[in-house]
Amino acid sequence: MYQDLIRGELTEAADTLSRFLQDDANIEAIQKAAVLLADSFKAGGKVLSCGNGGSHCDAMHFAEELTGRYRENRPGYPAIAISDVSHISCVSNDFGYEYVFSRYVEAVGKEGDVLLGISTSGNSGNIIKAISAAREKGMKVITLTGKDGGKMAGSADIEIRVPHFGYADRIQEIHIKVIHILIQLIEKEMEK
């Protein structure tokens, strides 16, 4: 009954991944991001991650697998997803939703830390403000974006962009793969 739809969805997902893999710059950016994160951890820094909607879940997933575990047991790494409901509701109410991430970065970010901003469109105003706040703190910035990178294009030290112009879910599927690879590479770097 739905076999053609199922095959079509899986084929589109595979094609999106294949196109992403064909650009060596993506592979290089993932490696550089992992080394940047591990270097921050080794120097006493941390990563703050943020996103909206499904990307918010990805930001939480990233932090959870760094502080908890990925595939193997190892020490936890310093990662915070900006996801505290009381913070988000307070800042949204008192300042506006566009400040929910930047206020947190202003409060706990420091030089040597890293901000990971995740936005499938690259146009999330609250992440753009978080990037500005991170820059003011002397933090490094990594972004996971999609399409043409949107307004966030060129704003990060390292941008990992999925150039898919369809629905956001295809971009998110690549983002979660990138997140898992980042964690795997961070673990290898931390063993050095």
UniProtKB/Swiss-Prot annotation:
Pathway where it operates: Carbohydrate biosynthesis; D-glycero-D-manno-heptose 7-phosphate biosynthesis; D-glycero-alpha-D-manno-heptose 7-phosphate and D-glycero-beta-D-manno-heptose 7-phosphate from sedoheptulose 7-phosphate: step 1/1
Where is it chiefly localized?
cytoplasm
InterPro entries the UniProt entry points to: GmhA/DiaA, Phosphoheptose_Isoase, SIS_dom, SIS_dom_sf, SIS_GmhA/DiaA_subfam
**Could you cite one Gene Ontology molecular function of this protein?**
zinc ion binding
Q: Which Gene3D superfamilies would you find in this protein's record?
A: Glucose-6-phosphate isomerase like protein, domain 1
The EC number on file is 5.3.1.28
Concerning HAMAP family, the annotation shows:
GmhA
Q: What is this protein called?
A: Phosphoheptose isomerase
